[in-house]
């Protein structure tokens, strides 16, 4: 059975460190996991999509996702690890957890964005929600 990890990527410095941690972890354990780089774009509310055609919305979400994934893809190509990148649309936390489960990932790796637990709860932190929703281990990288 091949080990696979989902790495949540939003283009931030903490998510870049999550990618670096996955590379380091694979090298130190002498693993060749399949890495799923996943960026989740928010779905636009219906009152916005009434005025913008679906193709424009799709293009915007794809371009934004590609920008967020670019650096992570470069790092993984240089590492020689097997990976695939995915841009999904929806609420970030449940979308990440669902993707990880559907693809039999052994863990989710994501950056911790440095909010305190109380602030994170009030802000609806994606990290807090993923930890709460996921039946899989979640590795948070500072």
Language-model region placement:
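Small/aliphatic-rich secondary-structure junction motif
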Residues: 1-51
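Small-residue (primarily alanine) positions within well-ordered alpha-helices
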Residues: 15-18, 22, 72, 100, ...
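Phosphate- and divalent-cation-binding pockets in alpha/beta enzyme and binding domains
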Residues: 17, 95, 117
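General small-molecule cofactor/ligand-binding pocket signal
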Residues: 36-38, 84-88, 139
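Short beta->alpha linker loops
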Residues: 52, 87-91, 113
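A short acidic, glycine-rich active-site loop
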Residues: 54-67
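Structural beta-alpha unit
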Residues: 74-108
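Gly/Ser-rich helix-loop-strand patches that form or flank binding pockets
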Residues: 98-142
């Amino acid at each position: 059975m091949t080990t696979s990890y989902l790495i949540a990527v939003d283009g931030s410095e903490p998510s870049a460190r999550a990618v670096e941690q996955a590379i380091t972890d694979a090298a130190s354990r002498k693993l060749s996991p399949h890495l799923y780089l996943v960026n989740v774009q928010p779905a636009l509310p219906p009152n916005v999509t009434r005025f913008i055609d679906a193709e424009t919305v799709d293009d915007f979400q794809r371009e934004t996702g590609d920008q967020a994934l670019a650096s992570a893809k470069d790092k993984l190509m240089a590492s020689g690890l097997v990976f695939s990148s995915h841009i999904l649309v929806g609420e970030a936390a449940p979308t990440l957890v669902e993707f990880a489960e559907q693809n039999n990932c052994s863990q989710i790796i994501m950056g911790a964005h440095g909010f305190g637990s109380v602030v994170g709860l009030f802000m609806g932190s994606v990290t807090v929600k993923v930890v709460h929703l996921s039946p899989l281990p979640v590795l948070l990288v500072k």
